[in-house]
């Protein structure tokens, strides 16, 4: 069967300009010239407005459409677009006006219409187009008869056939065309006089082929160039608000503000603002309110940090007023002083005031915050490579305290050693270290401390060399253990016996030698060493020395845990946590206090899945009370309390990757966590609960219905509510750590404080917070997926061994 061939041209290929020409307007009883306007709309774009004036009445209504286009003398109108640029919904908007019969300067509306350039078949209209116009309301009242409609319909049909003939769509037969044209002229002459609707004749360009609409597709650019534009005013304050603030805070209001006292409503607003956590941003209205009542607030020590946040530090007059109020303000607590050392407060006098408040802290209290205070040195006065170091008040304070306290001096030294390895701030911390060494050399006691620190550095270097040698030694674990003992006995390391040396991990302990036979190598990827040291008092001190692990994150967790333990004891709540010690001696090595214990996985394997059996064997109850499950009440109390403490604290810190191999229990029942490689909500496992509380841990308390489990939950609620009271201190400590080179803090440092704050549930009342934590416990115990993960982990450990 022969294929039908249809010749056409796609509109996207037609680059000719789209042109149109006015011909005539036919309407009844009118000889006046008409003014017509025509506008092209293509897509969402409108073209320029074209306006033409011409005589509307044609001399002979019997003329055919093909003859009308020939007698038109108007020029072609160019809309500045090509046919290829026309959209499918492109249309004309046409309106016609004629002079008024009474006043030639006034024009009357004749008609208007919209006319699509592509028909219902997506073909571009060509040749002469006959377009009826919509008339005014008066004309619309006329309703043509059915006979008139039939006549108009017939005329349109004949005109359409003539247009097809003109376009070549119908073959031409000369003798038949002459007869047909005569009949059509007679019909038009007879019936056109009855048509009352204005009709516009427009002449479109004609092409050799039908033009079918087709979208234009642009080729993909190989050389793409992206441009970014920046709004320079995007983050700027509104000038009107700035002007208002200057007027509100004008110095002329100063004398009046001194006598201002808030009413009960404003007092509640101020109390609400002062209760905000440190990370909460104050609105402009809240800042203005704090500033307005600044003199009244000087008697409230909790208001200073909020007041300093409300100061516009670019306004010298405000700065002078704010600084003058510092000395008259009620002395603030240490936790608020820590907030003033955060990156949010950069003015030297504000930071100096914070340091003056730290001077009231005891050495024991200062040790709890020392890690963060070292990090706060970053925000004092950063120095460039060509700038001379000027010690800040904080640096001088830390150095002076370190000279007077060996414990602070020990920790400060090792914190600085680690930070010096961090390239961006190496010069700053090297300068502080130089200042520390320089001040030590000024006194006999100081020189002794300096010699001790130097001996500690050499001691750690020996352990590092031994650890690297063991790691590079080829052989089984047993061979590595034998090789370790040989190295420890080697006289070149001088580790068997030496002069008393404060252990860097715990400077309160003086070690005098090592016991090689009690040392071993753990079966782990990094092959950490377990070393046992002889102490000056005859005791022994076991440690784990790790090379290849960054212990700074673990060090932070244990430091916060130790602080929380102190805070709970102040609230008369002793959870028997006994946190162990961790010290990073470098970016990739450090020491951990070894606590004799067994992992939960080992206990379950050796005691047939029973924590109770493990506790009973190591702590048998001599009494006949069956309520203790045959376990010494002290051991059971240790277990219940420490479980509660670690569950709450690890939840608050978002400790992840919890499994049965990093949950441990000592013989006397102390429960604790190890390996803090994931914190702040990060976890390599899917669907991990917010808190690790396995059913094995609960069964160690006697099960869900035992009184010990109820006691455990009570300890959890009390611990959670007690730590919520100290949330500002914890949040301030984390705000000082946001730029520390710690993996899970660097991961998303902008949200570090927010993640910790979120877990305190500070937006809840105390009763709601307890209900929330109760639900958290229930969800953790009943979670199925962690149990599956624990089983898979145990299987993986078995296969690995």
Swiss-Prot record:
Originating organism: Schizosaccharomyces pombe (strain 972 / ATCC 24843)
Alphabetically ordered keywords of this record: ATP-binding, Autophagy, Kinase, Nucleotide-binding, Transferase
Lineage: Eukaryota, Fungi, Dikarya, Ascomycota, Taphrinomycotina
Gene field: pik3
Disulfide bonds: none
Source superkingdom: Eukaryota
Keyword Magnesium: no
UniProt-recorded name of the protein: Phosphatidylinositol 3-kinase pik3
Function: Phosphatidylinositol 3-kinase that functions as a part of the autophagy-specific VPS34 PI3-kinase complex I that plays a role in autophagosome assembly. This complex is essential to recruit the atg8-phosphatidylinositol conjugate and the atg12-atg5 conjugate to the pre-autophagosomal structure. Also functions as part of the VPS34 PI3-kinase complex II.
Domain PIK helical intervals: 257-439
